[in-house]
Amino acid sequence: YMPKHQRRIIQKIPDFDILSEHPQDLCEDVVREITEHKYTGVKYTKHAGVGEVISEHYDIRVGDEVIAFLYKPLACHSYNTIRINGDSHANGETIRIATIDTMLSFYLAFIYADRIYYDINRILCMSQFLFDVQQHNRLKQTGLLRRFSINCYGKQATLESMRFEKTAKYEELKGKRGTREFEEWFLRYVPYENAGARARALVARRL
């Protein structure tokens, strides 16, 4: 769905965003496989999640270049399937590709995560391209463009499990009030309360 001149540019960017229930195990497998092909300086790094928006995740690097990010799913994310390297089940291989809605939800979360390893301009460009593809193919519900798929990867959190996780996280962070991690999990912002506080402060100054 991408014009040839744009496709040539993207092919030079060997970046992957991958969902895995066991991202650390997958990182170890990938690093071992790449190292066996005589590449050096291959390693992976773990990064903390961002509240309830982005889970704990890992990057895989060859030297200074990041080639993949791996995320543990926070919900059940929809995907479509395609076959490559053959048309039949005997000689082909099925791969899962996230739906455009799933990709956009992650990309927009990356923008607001404020992490130095995310290239905001690249993310915005890819988000715009995906949005345009979706707009131009609104009525096409086949292949990778199928928007609503019954297939999903990961486990959808229930209200009970979310409460349990938040309680456990509060016990872990209650001694770190004022830190960024605490605010990402428990920041409470109520606009009308803040407006009322500013109004009271203004009246007090005038008096």
What is each of the regions a protein language model found here?
Residues 33-78:
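Conserved catalytic core of two-metal-ion nucleotidyltransferases
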Residues 7-8, 37-41, 87-91:
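Short, low-complexity, polar/charged sequence segments that are solvent-exposed and flexible
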Residues 1-24:
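Active-site nucleotide-donor binding segment shared across nucleotidyl transfer reactions
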Residues 24-31:
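Short, conserved charged micro-motifs
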Residues 1-6, 31-32, 136, 201:
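Proteins with a high burden of low-complexity, intrinsically disordered sequence enriched in S/T/G/P/A and R
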Residues 67-206:
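Active-site and adjacent loop segments of nucleotide-processing enzymes
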